[in-house]
């Protein structure tokens, strides 16, 4: 049966950890596996890191640059070399590829999000393997950066409604702690629900490699995003991409995250994960219960505080009285308007604002439970 597969490979798997030079044997193995999966009728997308790391090696830089302008320049050098190498390897197997560079802004805008989805779907129909990376050269605003390709791969998996997301990294699976530091760390084979990780006392840490940006914490976060979209997610060893067909065949390799039994629909997945929240609404207990358990829209009467500056139709986070995030949604009022009507009954709003606004602050169709 044909399936849609998204595979993310990180800088630590693509390069030598000491020199930053390309691990050509790993790339050759990866290309062979992906080409074979495509020949078997599967649709395949590769999300590849490595542009900055490869650029550093090409320019003789001893470490990853921290200054944004320099990092963007280095990424431009590395991205061209990375794609040339992929093209050489894939062409030797008669497998066409395409370069797709995305920014967070591309996915935060609804029309561009849909257009990106349409483009990827057309490439897949043509039998092409899209190679996706963040467009580091133009992603200036830190709020509009993915920050790491783990998050990007999870959003792409949701974008194309993939069946599988494989996050290839420098360990064979998720452990209760870093096995390179703590030899008694326990392997985790299957995660049915993300809440299980807290019960297992998983210490993911936050450190990426010298040449990359994503640590294990970002991979767990990416798994949460993907599984909420109904995508089965696997964290496994990047140096052995030949394990991917074995996992698809049912072997227990890596850590497998089961898809959420009630995944978000495409629009709600976009609201929950592709948008960048610009403010916070603090809710009283009645409003928190109404939206989380009763499926209600949010009314002004249930808001106790407004934080941040935002306009109508921007994304905000909702917090309960204990300070826990419980939902996200698109607001029908600006932060200035909400400061004036918070705690008010709906029938009082026209008098307070001087005009008739929306009946709800956030309609339930534009609201996603996250907590």
Swiss-Prot record:
One of its GO terms (biological process) is L-proline biosynthetic process. Coiled coil: none annotated. It is found in: Cytoplasm. Residues 278-356 form the PUA domain. Its EC number is 2.7.2.11. Belongs to the glutamate 5-kinase family. This is Glutamate 5-kinase. It comes from Acaryochloris marina (strain MBIC 11017).
């Amino acid at each position: 049966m044909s399936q849609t597969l998204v595979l993310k490979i990180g800088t630590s798997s693509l390069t030598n950890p000491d020199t930053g030079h390309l691990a050509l044997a790993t790339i050759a193995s990866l290309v062979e596996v992906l080409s074979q999966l495509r020949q078997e009728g599967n649709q395949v997308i590769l999300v590849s890191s490595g542009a900055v790391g490869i650029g550093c090696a090409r320019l003789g830089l001893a470490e990853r640059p921290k200054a944004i302008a320099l990092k963007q320049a280095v990424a431009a050098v590395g991205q061209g070399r990375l794609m040339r190498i992929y093209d050489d390897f894939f062409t030797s197997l008669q497998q066409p590829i395409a370069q797709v560079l995305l920014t967070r802004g591309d996915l935060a805008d609804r029309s561009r999000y849909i257009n990106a989805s349409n483009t990827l779907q057309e490439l897949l129909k043509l039998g092409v393997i899209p190679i996706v990376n963040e467009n580091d050269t133009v992603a200036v605003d830190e709020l509009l950066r993915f920050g790491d390709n783990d998050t990007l791969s999870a959003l792409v998996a949701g974008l194309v409604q993939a069946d599988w997301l494989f996050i290839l990294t420098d360990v064979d699976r998720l452990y209760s702690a870093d096995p390179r530091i703590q030899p008694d760390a326990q392997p985790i084979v299957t995660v049915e629900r993300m809440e299980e990780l807290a019960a297992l006392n998983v210490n993911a840490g936050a450190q990426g490699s010298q040449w990359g940006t994503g640590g294990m914490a970002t991979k767990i976060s990416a798994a949460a995003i993907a599984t909420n979209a109904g995508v089965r997610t696997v964290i496994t060893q990047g140096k052995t991409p030949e394990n991917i067909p074995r996992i698809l065949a049912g072997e227990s390799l890596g850590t497998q995250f089961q898809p959420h039994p009630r995944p978000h629909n495409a629009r709600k997945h976009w609201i929950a994960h592709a948008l960048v929240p610009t403010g916070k609404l603090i809710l009283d207990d009645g409003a928190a219960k109404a939206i989380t358990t009763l499926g209600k829209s949010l009314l002004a009467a249930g808001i106790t505080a407004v934080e941040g500056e935002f306009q109508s139709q921007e994304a905000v986070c909702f917090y309960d009285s204990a300070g826990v995030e419980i939902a996200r949604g698109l607001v029908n009022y600006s932060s200035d308007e909400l400061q004036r009507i918070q705690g008010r009954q709906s029938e009082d709003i026209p008098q307070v604002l001087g005009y008739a606004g929306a009946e709800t602050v956030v309609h339930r169709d534009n609201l996603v439970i996250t907590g």
